[in-house]
Amino acid sequence: MANALDYVDWRGDLSFDTVPVNEIDKYIFTCIGKPDYTGIIPADGKTVTVNEAVGSYFATREDVGDKLGLISSASTLPMLRKIALSDRFRDIKLSGFINKVVVEKTEQFSALTVFSPDGVKYVSFRGTDDTIVGWKENCELAVKEVVPAQLDAKAYLEWAAETYD
């Protein structure tokens, strides 16, 4: 069965003017937010391109290999390598990266904003990673009304709406 890697091979040479943003593109936008781009994607509202961010990520993390932890899809890093070079995705702007881990509060949160060529801004939340903090936070979702990362997500959306309006 075809997957997002196949899609990038198939449509990676086509601009968004030729083929508008679709559900698979939106899925790829979410995958862009999986790695830790600390020091690569600005947190202050300035932007970098997908090509710049992914290139810097692999250049500064030589030991990353082809897999992004135990629970992330094995296709995430190979897909990022492909989109960084593709005509379709390489010039998309990224901004507002945050990666927050507070062990004492059982808090794990990460997000960035993707500036889609159709003018829509997408927020990519990483979700649970393979740290103990992330898994403990997941368990707390079952017994708490609100966990710290949910408050972080709300604050991030408010910040992004104000910053990128």
What are the residue ranges of the model-derived segments?
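Non-catalytic, mobile gating and regulatory segments of ester bond hydrolases
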Residues: 1-164
